[in-house]
Design a protein with these regions (language model features):
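N-terminal strand-loop element at the rim of the active site
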Residues: 7-13, 20-67, 197
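Conserved alpha-helical elements of sugar-nucleotide-dependent glycosyltransferases
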Residues: 11-22, 171-178, 236
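Short alpha-helical segment that forms part of, or immediately flanks, the ligand-binding pocket
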Residues: 218, 241-246
Length: 248
């Protein structure tokens, strides 16, 4: 089978990362063909993300989801997979069987597409009474045991709380203030952020540029003793949360 995977924006967030894993194992385990489509109309694509996809898959830029019907016949697509909030919108095809992966709580009246699934067991139980099945993210980390402590001049006895995710995903103002108060009182604590928009200046609140490099991301997680999160929207199954969890 030929399966298309549609990504709105090629960025460093969980949707692009998880879609890569689904497309990869769709070929490796299920022996299907994966084709990647992304919306050229979005403004914040990361070149390194597009490059990584192109090393493994055929990648096509389209002018919105509306162009998918054209490629469905041209490339003989059996299905098109897309992650989104879950509400009815224009990201569904009338000609290609569309697989909807819902990330957020929705009413059952929002069901659409050929198949509709939730991203987590919690989402399925809490908001659909298990009427809608769930498929969680594939959580995979590189095996390296190296960390960034020496490079970042973090002392061995310091406790490191870390967070990585979308640039705007650590947006609770009162948490920002709490972190500043904490580092003033505790010199043995530091906070480390990957791809998070900088919200303060302090030598023990460190902000690192985002990366799609799996080795670097694992080094970042290895540097941390625990994850800290401060997203106003919350998560139903955050990929970053899963990555920290399997680290132990």
């Amino acid at each position: 089978m030929n399966i298309g995977f549609f990504i709105g924006e090629m960025n460093l967030r969980g949707v692009a990362n998880s879609t890569y894993q689904y497309a990869y194992y769709n070929e490796r385990l299920l022996k299907n063909k994966s084709l990647i489509f992304y919306n050229k109309e979005e403004k914040f694509h990361k070149k390194e993300v597009i490059s990584k996809f192109r090393k493994k898959f055929k990648v096509i830029g389209v002018n919105g989801f509306k162009e998918m019907d054209h490629y469905g016949k041209k490339l003989n697509l059996d299905y098109i997979y897309v992650q989104k909030g879950g509400q009815k919108d224009h990201n569904v095809s009338n000609k290609i069987k569309t697989l909807i992966h819902s990330l957020y709580p929705q009413n059952l009246k929002e069901l659409h597409g050929h198949k509709y699934i939730c991203v987590s067991e919690w989402l399925s139980k809490k908001f659909t009474n298990t009427k809608i099945p769930f498929v969680p993210y594939i959580v995979k980390l590189h095996k390296t045991k190296n960390n960034l402590k020496k490079k970042l001049k973090i002392k061995k006895n310091q406790i490191v709380f870390g967070c990585h995710g979308g640039e705007s995903s650590f947006d609770l103002k009162f948490v920002h203030q709490t972190l500043l108060e904490t580092v003033k009182k505790r010199k043995d604590i530091c906070f480390l952020f990957l791809n998070i928009k900088k919200f303060c200046n302090h030598p023990r609140i460190i902000f690192l540029k985002g990366s799609f490099d799996e080795v670097y991301k694992k080094k970042f997680i290895n540097t941390c003793d625990a994850m800290i999160y401060g997203r106003s929207l919350g998560e139903s199954f955050g990929l970053a949360c899963g990555e920290f969890s399997i680290q132990g």
